[in-house]
Amino acid sequence: MSEYRIKVAPNTVAYADAENHKLVVEFAIPGAPTATIDVKILEDSIHLTAPARDIEYVSALALAWPVKPEKAEAIYEHGLLRIEVPFKDPMEDAVKVAVKASGPDIKAE
């Protein structure tokens, strides 16, 4: 039989570091061994699970602005997990659309 842990939402702070164009998220997860922390990041969300003694920290955050998950960095120190991930340029994947004239072309002045 697997060990049951009570699921607990960690204290969380998330803010935009506008100067460095990054999202910073901090999770307070004291007692969680580094090797058991599981963080998954998508462009629009962050998911965390971290077992610690008789509890399991769990969190799922929906992000208002897309990020670049492949460039995320995470540091765990003194029970605080800090994640920094750059924001994605909203035009990064934009596709240029060719415009055709349907009548006489207007000349640029």
Residue locations for each model-derived region?
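Alpha-crystallin/small heat shock protein
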Residues: 1-109
